[in-house]
Amino acid sequence: VIHLDELRYDASWNVVSEEEFFAAQRKVVAGARWVVDGNGSASLPIRAAAADTIIVLDPHPLVCLAGIILRGLRYGGGQHPGGVYVRVNCEFLHYVVSYRRKTLPKVLRVLDEHAGHATVLHLTSRRSANRLIRELDDAERGHQ
């Protein structure tokens, strides 16, 4: 699993150039098997064109805010074990609250344009996400 933040920031958490960010994603999606976690709307066409499956996580904004609070308590606002630095500010909170209204329609348009070949799963609850994880886990165990 590649977190987009790992590609977007250097080791000192400085933003890399857009060209470097896009090139890093092209390198990842050129691989045979990959999972990318993150939104990165401007570079979504790169990932969408190469993906066979796209999972759009779209829980209610209050669920997202609760998750942000819990992560903040768990990691103290710093870097969690996965290496992603927790950045919470007013701009980020506004983005989360307005995501469904402002960003999601753009994401869905990009997917319509660039991911017609892919299976797109639009999950709107933790329950549906957990169900998918169980189904994938069961399918993986069935192939072993």
Where are these regions (language model features)?
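Alpha-helix boundary recognition
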Residues: R26-A30, A48-A49, I69, V97, ...
